[in-house]
Structure formats: structure tokens, C-alpha cells
Amino acid sequence: MSQSKQASILDSRILVPAIADAFKKLNPRTLARNPVMFVVATVSVLTTVLFIRDLITGGANLAFSFQINLWLWFTVLFANFAEAVAEGRGKAQADSLRKTRTETQAKLLNSDDRSQYKMVAGDSLKVNDVVLVEAGDIIPSDGEVIEGVASVNEAAITGESAPVIRESGGDRSAVTGGTQVLSDWIRVRITAAAGSTFLDRMISLVEGAERQKTPNEIALNILLAGMTLIFVLATATIPSFAAYAGGSIPIIVLVALFVTLIPTTIGALLSAIGIAGMDRLVRFNVLAMSGRAVEAAGDVDTLLLDKTGTITLGNRQATDLRPIPGVSEQELADAAQLASLADETPEGRSIVVLAKEKYGIRARDMQKLHATFVPFTAQTRMSGVDFEGASIRKGAVDAVLAYVDGGALQHGNAALALKTETDATRAIRAIAEDIAKAGGTPLAVVRDGKLLGVVQLKDIVKGGIRERFAELRRMGIRTVMITGDNPMTAAAIAAEAGVDDFLAQATPENKLELIREEQAKGKLVAMCGDGTNDAPALAQADVGVAMNTGTVAAREAGNMVDLDSDPTKLIEIVEIGKQLLMTRGALTTFSIANDIAKYFAIIPAMFLALYPQLGVLNVMGLSTPQSAILSAIIFNALIIIALIPLSLKGVKYRPIGAGALLSRNLVIYGLGGIIVPFIGIKLIDLAVTALGLA
């Protein structure tokens, strides 16, 4: 993957096969998929037959007819070449992926005893077979971890060298065939038979073998076919005007007029634009299951984003220590630091850092203190340390308060529990409520049954994310933050991040309901997820981006898979989708605008002998009627080659509103589509005349 990302359209490994493929695509069945180019190929065959007839019978203007014929075929070949280059980039990626395939042997298990396995060929495995994969083994096929935990190297799929953890029973249980276990062991239930693994699907998709035309492509093809039919009828009426004046127009000239007026530019590049859109996603390590998903991303109205890892860094950091009355900050900091010395969570490490940087308290040796660390559990929701007869705990406010009350009653201090600790409890609850309103998470600290205060943890909003949301807003996209936090915390983080709305205390059912509500309003919705509980919402969303680290159910439900498992990519995916639609629209505008200049080149040339007064339309001052027609047909072919890089790279994306974007593109590609042909045809005319070609 990483190597193929560097492939350029100037790479000989792509260009040379593309030239050969351009000739192979002259197959009528292949050409028939593109109505415009099929018509051009048909008239090219017709003019070739007429040229051969004239060559045999000794017709006039053979040199002119030969050149027109040659450039008509070049037009078809250049269109085929554009598509072949786009496909070639995908084939280069597919070849890179194929190299990661290895003939693997699998340890097929027939019982729960890990030592009892049978070595079989990896491609003989069936769905629901259970295999053992140990350190150094290649995972033989896609599957779900049902037992164990292991470090897995997924560089063959993602291009990232850092290993990832795969374990049973969570949202990191999916494994991909062709990846390697680096440490420990896992028991895997096979979920994909040979030939239908994730790697097989990737190869098939990036090659374009299964690429189907999207609804927008089909609609545009219908429009182009309709315009072609109109120009067929228009061209067919022209001989009658010539006959009325007592003259005639050669068929080769009529064909030249017809081919230059139909939208050959966009017709030639349409397929390449679609392939390149999916290719850009693949280079971004996102796999789209269909071109429809890429287009939908460009039309998205509502973006659902998980708070953790997307809007915030995901690792809550200690930002402040707030003691209750009668307790100093230093005392609270000392206790919080001791309780966190052996806590390897991001929150625990941040408390140690805060105590050192703000209060000058350095880390202490747990062994010298003869301390026993008390780990966090889901049942206690606390962690802490016991040493030298002292006991310190930190954790969720309600859990710590219950711990304090229980300890006071256990030692017979009922009055103390009811009076002294009630005052402290009120103070703790008040501080905790203030922190929650500010978008933070409170952790209460207690030492030997005495409440000391609260550690304020805060989800750090990612730098620049507010500006990104402002860009999306200018594009007319509504952003909704999805979080399990309480409404007060969610509102504070939403305000800081700059999202348009939020869904607090979200459940899978809430997400699904929100998506359906938005779609009922006629809006397209995009979201990302990685868990089995996200699968219904991913399937319902118009753009569902599943994380590669997620469950099999999530990956099957989404219509895109992010190989890097980075939720923030959802924003870039929308931008790539919009770039695809912008490129298609811009080049369609440019192609249609081209006709104006070609009209001024060919119409005067056709009728100059019959209607001399039409000479005023020769605003470009083209040398002769034949040079004008030849220059127009040459420009018509060369502009396809000139625009291949733009069709593959895409029009530059700018986060502005639809109205401003339309105005900008009309100026650049509409006005540019008029001016460029005037200049191009004139320069070609000068060259044709200088070389004596017409």
C-alpha cells in the first residue's frame, strides 16, 4: 500500500501498459459502455472506409481526409488512454497487495485443547472453522478472535509498521488474513472463505474489476447521449443549407464538425474521474466499497462524529486540583500523586505530571514506601495505594463517597459520618457539579477516610478542530457530536469544539433514530463506528465508515473501511467526495464551453465558399478553411491528454458555500472553456500552416 501510494501518472510502469490497454479498449463491447466515445469510434470507422474508397478510386483531398481520420482515431485512443491510466494506478496498488499474499498453513483446532491441532492449507479453511495462531504465524484468513490477546503486524494491509492489539470480547476482535501475529497467541473463528477475504475484496476494488457506474455517472451519460443525439440531428440538416446555395459539403467535414461539437472531452474523461475518486480514497488508506459511497460523501448534509478520539484527544488529562475547605492544594496534590504513581492510564500519568509541574512534587519509589497499589476495577470504580498504615483512594465521586461512608460506619463513627462528612460531601458534590458544567470529569480523592478534594480531568479538544468545523459549516454541512457524557459535559465540549449540535448519553438506538430523522428530512448522513453496536447505524447511514480495528459486524455494515482506524478521517472523506463531484462538474462545464470556439472555427470554414458574408465569424483569423477544420479536430483530441492530470488529481478543493463555489467554477472552467480553445486552435492553425499540412 505504502509503495503504491507514490505511483505517478508519469511512471513508466503505468504509462506503457496504459498505451497497450488503449488499443485493447477499441473492442466495441468496451466502447459501448461510453456512449459518446462509441459514437466517435463509429464515425471514425465510417470515415476510414470512405478514405480507403477514395484512395482506391483516386478521390480529391486525400491528405486532408487522412489527417482528419488520424485525429479522429487519436481522439478515441486518448479517451481510452485516460481510462487506462486511471485503472493502471489501481492495478499497481493491486499488484502491491498481491505480493503480501503468501501460501499459509493453518493450525486447525477440533477441540479446546490448544496442543491438539491439524496442519492444513490456509485456502482450504471454511467459514466457522477455528484455528490457532501463535507468535510468528500468518493469520490464514479473515476471522474473529474468540480467545486470547496478541500483538499483530498489519503493515501488509495498512502500511503502518506499528503493531496493534487484537483480543477477544471487544471492539478489537477482528483480524485480517495475511497479517502476522508478533507475540502471544489467539484462537480465531474464520469468517471468510478463500477468495472472499478482506484482502481479496481490496484487490478487486482497487483494480476496478467490480466498479459499477454511479447514479450521477449514469445521469450524466444520459445527458451527454442526449446532447450527442441533438448534434447528430443538427449536423444532418447542414447539407440542406449547402444544397439551397447550390453547393455541397464533404462528409469528412460534416464528421469533423459533429465530433468537435459533441462533448467528447467530458465523455473521454468521465470514467477516469470516477476511478480516480476511489483511487484518492485508497491512497488515503480508506477503502470504498462502491463509487456510490464516494459520491454520497460529496453530498453529505449531516456529519455524526464521536467525541472521543475524533473531537477530543481521547485521553483525559488532569488540569486542576480543587481541595475542599480546610484542605490545602499541596495536601491534595500529594495524596493524588501517591494514588497515581503506579497508575499507567493516561489519566493517572497526567496527575503525576500535574503534581510535579504545578506543585513541585517529585515521583517516589513505591518499593521504598512498601506500598501496595490498588488497581482500578469496574466494580469499585476506584484505584489507589496502601502504605505504612495509610490508605489513599481516587475515583468516581459517588464511588468514593460510598467508600467513605462505609468506612466511617464500619469504625463506629456514625456521628462523624452524618455530620463532618456531610459537610465535606456537600463541598465535593458542589465542586464535581462545577467541573461537569465546564465539560470536565471529576475524580474525588480520600486519605484515611478523609475527603480531600477533587481532581479535574478534561477531554482536550484537538487543536484546529474548531476551524475544521467552521469550514464544514461554510460548506453547508451540519455537525453533530455523539457522546456518552451527561448533557452538561456534552454541552460544554460541544461549545468549545464549535459543533452545531450534540447527542448526549447516546445509545446505539439513539444514533439510529437520529440518522433516520435526518434522512426523513431529505438529508444525507455520514458517520463512523467500530463496534458491533454501531452496525445498525453504519448500515443506515448514507456514508458509513467502519474502523479496520473494529468488529466484523461493523466492517460488513459500513460502505467504507478506514484501514488506519482514524475517526477524524470522516472529514477528509467528505472533502474527497466533494472534490470528485467538483471535478466532474468543472470538466463538464469546460467541455460544453469549448463548443463556442469550435463553432467559430468550423462554421465559417464550411460555408465560406457558399456564403462569403460568414467570413466575419472567422474572429480567430484562421488561415484557410481546411486548416481551421484540422486545427479544431487536433485541439479536440489534444485537450483530452492535457486534462488527464486534472481528472486524476481532481479540482482543488476549497471549503466555501455552494453559491460561491458555483460562481468560481463558472469563471474558471466556463469562461476558461471559452478562452482556452480560441488560443489553442489559433496556435495549432499557425503550426499547421507553417508545416504545410493544410
From Swiss-Prot:
UniProt-listed Enzyme Commission number(s): 7.2.2.6
Gene Ontology cellular component list: plasma membrane
Binding site residues for Mg(2+): 530, 534
Active site per UniProt: 306
Transmembrane segments: 36-56, 62-82, 218-238, 249-269, 600-620, 628-648, 666-686
Keyword set, alphabetical order: ATP-binding, Cell inner membrane, Cell membrane, Ion transport, Magnesium, Membrane, Metal-binding, Nucleotide-binding, Phosphoprotein, Potassium, Potassium transport, Translocase, Transmembrane, Transmembrane helix, Transport
Stored InterPro entries: ATPase_P-typ_cyto_dom_N (IPR023299), ATPase_P-typ_P_site (IPR018303), ATPase_P-typ_TM_dom_sf (IPR023298), ATPase_P-typ_transduc_dom_A_sf (IPR008250), HAD-like_sf (IPR036412), HAD_sf (IPR023214), P-type_ATPase_bsu_IA (IPR006391), P_typ_ATPase (IPR001757)
Membrane topology qualifier: Multi-pass membrane protein
CDD domains linked to this entry: P-type_ATPase_K (cd02078)
Residues at which ATP binds: 343, 347, 376-383, 394
UniProt cross-references to Pfam families, sorted A to Z: E1-E2_ATPase (PF00122), Hydrolase (PF00702)
Coiled coil location: none
Enzyme class: translocase
Subunit structure comment from the entry: The system is composed of three essential subunits: KdpA, KdpB and KdpC.
NCBIfam families: ATPase_P-type, kdpB
PANTHER family recorded: POTASSIUM-TRANSPORTING ATPASE ATP-BINDING SUBUNIT
Family under the similarity heading: Belongs to the cation transport ATPase (P-type) (TC 3.A.3) family. Type IA subfamily.
Task of the protein: Part of the high-affinity ATP-driven potassium transport (or Kdp) system, which catalyzes the hydrolysis of ATP coupled with the electrogenic transport of potassium into the cytoplasm. This subunit is responsible for energy coupling to the transport system and for the release of the potassium ions to the cytoplasm.
Protein's name according to its UniProt entry: Potassium-transporting ATPase ATP-binding subunit
Name of the gene encoding the protein in the UniProt record: kdpB
